[in-house]
From Swiss-Prot:
Region (Contains the Ser-Pro(4) repeats): 409-758
UniProt PTM: Hydroxylated on proline residues in the S-P-P-P-P repeat.
Entries under SUPFAM superfamilies matching the protein: L domain-like
Region (Disordered): 389-502, 515-610, 663-748
Annotated glycosylation sites: N16, N86, N98, N281, N332
Signal peptide location: 1-20
One Pfam short name: LRR_1
GO molecular function: peptide binding; structural constituent of cell wall
Organism: Arabidopsis thaliana
Tissue-wise expression: Expressed in roots, stems, leaves and flowers, mostly in vascular tissues.
Ranges of Pro residues composition bias in the record: 394-415, 423-502, 663-745
Main location (coarse class): secreted
Compartments in which it is found: Secreted, Cell wall
Listed name of the protein: Leucine-rich repeat extensin-like protein 3
Length: 760
């Protein structure tokens, strides 16, 4: 029997060999291309992802680094399984600096030679994987591939990219555990992993790394936030739509550079830190759609810079402190779907507020008396019972030594809790006031982050209303990946998010000024709208976001409207920026797709998301207490104008000098409150971090699935003609090292790759 099997295998080998020879161009010997093709197919199934590239001796290269770049890019080209827009069709020959999406600049250690400093293939709809050979691009400063269909994992040899400043892998189909190789990149400042399928825990080392922006929302991460969370120097961090649980870390109050933070739609279950008021520079604070309990700390009234405050869809109780509603910059306060029993009259005079579904006497649309009675009859929450980290000094009571045996020992002294002094860090530079026009949070059902599938190119402003993806499927993605236009053509890349379909209006846009604007162009919305989640506490099943219209699989990203997107919404495949020339300035417009595909990024996109369809509020639950976390959070549109100064000028194109970006301008997370209320936030141009929602997971080669239908995306239609965030070269507050890296700074561009601003 064994011999028979061996004979069959031998004949099978001969048949395959015959077929291979039959396709040979010369009839007898396989061409180099055919050999590489066979190798690539084998590598997809076996061994590590690496390809042997043979360099034609007749090719001449300016220097060895460009030769290495040729090898890396040819290996990558072979790892591409689908390139419907022919972005890599001109990746031929030795002049790698003329390849579409590849940008060269003088080397940092030798200005006389050119080297590949940036790669920008945003919104190219390419399917494939990242080969290990990419580690040969030793001078690479920025790597932007958002809104494609890349799958697999991040190559281990990325650890050789010692100059990499911006890494944007958002809105793809990467999977597996957190890519720890990014922790080995010494120059990395901007990390965007949004809208992928990463899972498991996030290494605590991430929060000790010197980063300025962390976007890991819309994945499948599940873990408790570590005690060193507060050690992170970031100005913007978005963890929304994952499966984090446990405490809100008490160390959170130590994040002195923090401008925007979004915990929305996770499973956090604790009280808010009592000294949360130490966050003096925060402009956007969103902890909606969790399971937080206890009162709203009085110290929230000390967060003097906050513009967008969202604590909706939790189980908070007590009275709203009047000091919170008197904050000087507060524009949108959403505290619906809790169990608050009192609010100061001043709260009713805020520009935008939502107090529905509480237990407030005399106010409309409150919970039923039965629900309120059932909840309030329970024992009050003891916030000290949560072990939430290092805020409490010695937990155990201090026991004084017992006196002599004859005397009874005195009772041990009560434990002493040292409360850290509140920091009064000066408020962040006054960024333009973000425009918060989030509609009031819809009924319990979390607002759907349904990135509207904008079918046509940039027609309507993209509406990014990502549905909360609490359910099994990956969270609907508002895609925040700012894809730079990457069509083969040389024209400068337009990072304008594709126009979202008019139907689903984005949730309220919070445009906090301070946060840095990461304008990663949002992936083009795909036609399919995201479903509206109007469900009660249980988060609606995440609908896989519709694939962005353009290749980007995910549907439109939310509007994290970072700096106003350049007017040009990248047409489905806007041509990539000219080869070496620096790309146009991209305000870190993350996803906000400019309304019209205008190649010039500066124009502010007009976001007039159609009013979200009325979200059908599920009838108030019976008297039973709604302890279950409220429905998935509504899409939060923090359209905070990009913080003026954040300039990570590491645009993909020409040499970008990565001077450590000044503290990014305020990122605008437009996390819409429940759809019903449309908050037209103030002047600041909304920053749309519209990273397209990640396309539903599909085979690598599969095009992104259409986005789910968006139900009631609350964002009120607004045309935000917010000029791109001032790209003022401010010294970045965070002392980021000046990156005089391969790419010269792109004027007016914050983070070169329009990383979707922090949002979902």
């Amino acid at each position: 029997m064994k011999k028979t099997i061996q004979i069959l295998l031998f004949f099978f080998f001969l048949i395959n060999l015959t077929n291979a020879l039959s396709i040979s161009s010369d009839g007898g010997v396989l061409s180099d291309n055919e050999v590489r093709h066979i190798q690539r197919r084998q590598l997809l199934e076996f061994a590590e992802r690496s390809v042997k590239i043979t360099v034609d001796p007749s090719l001449n290269f300016e220097n060895p680094r460009l030769r290495n770049a040729y090898i890396a890019l040819q290996a990558w080209k072979q790892a591409i399984l689908s390139d419907p827009n022919n972005f890599t069709s001109n990746w031929i020959g030795s002049n790698v600096c003329n390849y579409t999406g590849v940008f060269c600049s003088p080397a940092l250690d030798n200005r006389k030679i050119r080297t590949v400093a940036g790669i920008d293939l945003n919104h190219a709809d390419i399917a494939g994987y990242l080969p290990e050979e990419l580690g040969l691009l030793s001078d690479l400063a920025l790597f932007h591939v958002n809104s494609n269909r890349f799958c697999g994992t991040v190559p281990h040899r990325f650890n050789r990219l010692k100059l990499l400043f911006e890494l944007d892998l958002s809105n793809n189909r990467f999977a597996g555990k957190f890519p720890t190789v990014v922790l080995q990149l010494p120059s990395l400042k901007f990390l965007d992993l949004r809208f992928n399928e990463f899972e498991g825990t996030v290494p605590k080392e991430l929060f000790s790394k010197d980063l300025d922006a962390i976007f890991i929302n819309h994945n499948r991460f599940r873990f408790e936030l570590p005690e060193n969370f507060g050690d992170s120097p970031v100005s913007v961090i978005v963890l929304a739509n994952n499966r984090f649980h446990g405490c809100v870390p008490s160390s959170l109050v130590e994040m002195k550079n923090l401008n925007e933070i979004i915990f929305m739609n996770n499973g956090l279950n604790s009280c808010l830190p009592s000294d949360i008021g130490r966050l003096k520079n925060v402009t956007v604070f969103d902890v909606s759609f969790n399971e937080l309990v206890g009162p709203l700390p009085e110290s929230v009234g000390e967060m003097v810079s906050v513009e967008q405050l969202n604590v909706a869809h939790n189980m908070l109780s007590g009275k709203i402190p009047a000091s919170i509603c008197q904050l000087p910059k507060l524009e949108n306060f959403t505290y619906s779907y809790n169990f608050f029993t009192g609010e100061a009259p001043v709260c009713l005079r805020l520009p935008e507020f939502d107090d529905r579904r509480n237990c407030l006497p005399g106010r409309p649309a409150q919970r039923s008396p039965g629900q309120c009675k059932a909840f309030l009859s329970r024992p009050p929450v003891n916030c000290g019972s949560f072990s939430c980290g290092r805020s409490v000094s010695p937990r155990p009571p201090v026991v004084t030594p017992l006196p002599p045996p004859s005397l009874p020992s005195p009772p041990p002294p009560a434990p002493i809790f040292s409360t850290p002094p509140t920091l009064t860090s000066p408020p962040p530079p006054s960024p333009p006031p973000p425009v918060y026009s989030p509609p009031p949070p819809p009924p319990p059902p979390p607002p759907v982050y349904s990135p509207p599938p904008p079918p046509p190119p940039p027609p309507p402003p993209p509406v990014y209303s990502p549905p909360p993806p609490p359910p099994p499927p990956p969270p609907p993605p508002p895609v925040y990946s700012p894809p730079p236009p990457s069509p083969p053509p040389p024209p400068p890349p337009v990072y304008s998010p594709p126009p979202p379909p008019p139907p689903p209006p984005p949730p309220p846009v919070y445009s906090p000024p301070p946060p840095p604007v990461y304008s990663s162009p949002p992936p083009p919305p795909s036609p399919a709208p995201t479903p509206v989640y109007c469900t009660r506490p249980p988060p609606p099943p995440p609908h896989s976001p519709p694939p962005p219209q353009f290749s980007p699989p995910p549907p439109e990203p939310y509007y994290y409207s970072s700096p106003p997107p350049p007017h040009s919404s990248p047409p489905p495949h806007s041509p990539p920026p000219p080869h070496s020339p620096p790309p146009p300035i991209y305000p870190y417009l993350s996803p906000p797709p400019p309304p019209t595909p205008v190649s010039s990024p500066p124009p502010t996109p007009v976001y007039s998301p159609p009013p979200p369809p009325p979200c059908i509020e599920p009838p108030p639950p019976p008297p039973c207490i709604e302890y279950s976390p409220p429905p998935p959070p509504p899409v939060v549109h923090y359209s905070s104008p990009p913080p003026p100064p954040v300039y990570y000028s590491s645009p993909p194109p020409p040499p970008v000098y990565y001077s450590s970006p000044p503290p990014p301008p305020p990122v605008h997370y437009s996390s819409p409150p429940p759809p019903e209320v449309h908050y037209h936030s103030p002047p600041p141009s909304p920053v749309h971090y519209s990273s397209p929602p990640p396309p539903p997971s599909a085979p690598c080669e599969e095009s992104p699935p259409p986005a789910p239908v968006v139900h009631h995306s609350p964002p009120p239609p607004m045309v935000h003609h917010s000029p791109p965030p001032p790209v003022i070269h401010q010294s970045p507050p965070p002392p980021s090292p000046e990156y005089e890296g391969p790419l010269p700074p792109v004027i007016g561009v914050s983070y070169a790759s329009p990383p979707p601003p922090p949002f979902y």
